[in-house]
Amino acid sequence: MPYLTSTGTARRTSGAEQLGFGVPGCAHPLLAPAEWAELARPGTPLHWAVLDIDDGPGIRPDPHCLEAAGRLRNARERAVRGEDPLDSVRASAGRLLGRLDLVHGSRPFGDLVADAQSYLDWYRVDGFYLDRCPAGRPDLPTVRRLTGTLSALLADSGSARHGGHLVLGHDTHPHPGYAEAADQLVTFRGAWTDYRWSQVAEWTASYPPGRFAHFVHGVPRTHLEEAMRIARWQGAGTIFFTDRTRETDPGNGRGQSDPFATLPRYWDEIVSRIGPAISE
């Protein structure tokens, strides 16, 4: 695993620090209406959810996605105004992120910026999820250029609160320099069988848990508590754990199965374990 070091002196989070959900790839709202409704439900400790229409924003506004985006935005705004004291969708949470596929650094800069502008114009997204982001040092200047441009677009759009939110989907520990290029890094995405024996890069201890996210599939219900302990120990504040697997769940349209396309069967239980988010 790139840039993985000993965990000997790493600072870990305390059990008291609250986890929240990052939802990396819910299926299209037409196929998963119940899932999108759950994300906007009061009491769900949602940090953010990713919107992906057709491997990007598509060629025109999608009415089903417009409705889902509006529902999530309205839930967040109600919470910000304090209309529902138990609603987890706070000023810094419940964000809607548009998915941009960097294809490990091979996607042209202009195409990514054009997709980002479409997300902003049509869906008023709060930020972007940069999927398949490179992790090596040579690609760092290119990624920094992109995140700087995206931050400027978000600031100009007026739709994103506090300048928007950028997440880099490395799915592994990247070069430490990436930590200054975005708001959050996905440093693990994979199977439970790998996660339960995983290690953490020591440099991550210099940052708060809100800077890192872990996505794990194939987590048995009986191991939820263990999975949450690992996330806290490794300093990840945003998680998505599911019992679904690549072998048993539907494809993502590219001939691959996607265990993150729907919510886990124990969704209500994991929401209860984490509890509603606390107002900031």
Regions found by a protein language model. Name each.
Residues 2-280:
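Glycan-processing catalytic domains of CAZymes
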